[in-house]
Amino acid sequence: MKTGIHPDYVETTVQCGCGNTFTTRSTKKTGNIVVEVCSQCHPFYTGKQKILDSGGRVARFEKRYGKRGANKAANTDSADK
């Protein structure tokens, strides 16, 4: 192994936007990393996760034009009565 080719591995403080700080090790020379979210404020870890069903192309088509099979079945039931 060559000597002197590896970067220094220093103790680094990570600061989150929520105010949480923790210490880890990194090769970043300043010894300070600022992040927007961490495990203390990320919705997945806090349990405040909102599931957004944006749907895909099929859902968008069905919303725009309706489900062909569902409307057909509803129309035949009402016509039989």
UniProtKB/Swiss-Prot annotation:
Protein name according to UniProt: Large ribosomal subunit protein bL31
Function: Binds the 23S rRNA.
Molecular functions (GO terms): metal ion binding; rRNA binding; structural constituent of ribosome
SUPFAM superfamilies per UniProt: L28p-like (SSF143800)
Stated family: Belongs to the bacterial ribosomal protein bL31 family. Type A subfamily.
Organism in which the protein naturally occurs: Mycobacterium sp. (strain KMS)
Keywords on record: Metal-binding, Ribonucleoprotein, Ribosomal protein, RNA-binding, rRNA-binding, Zinc
One example of a Gene Ontology biological process annotation: translation
Cofactor: how bound: Binds 1 zinc ion per subunit.
GO cellular component terms attached to this protein's record: ribonucleoprotein complex; ribosome
Pfam family, one: Ribosomal_L31
Cofactor(s) the record lists: Zn(2+)
Assembly behavior: Part of the 50S ribosomal subunit.
Binding of Zn(2+), residues: 16, 18, 38, 41
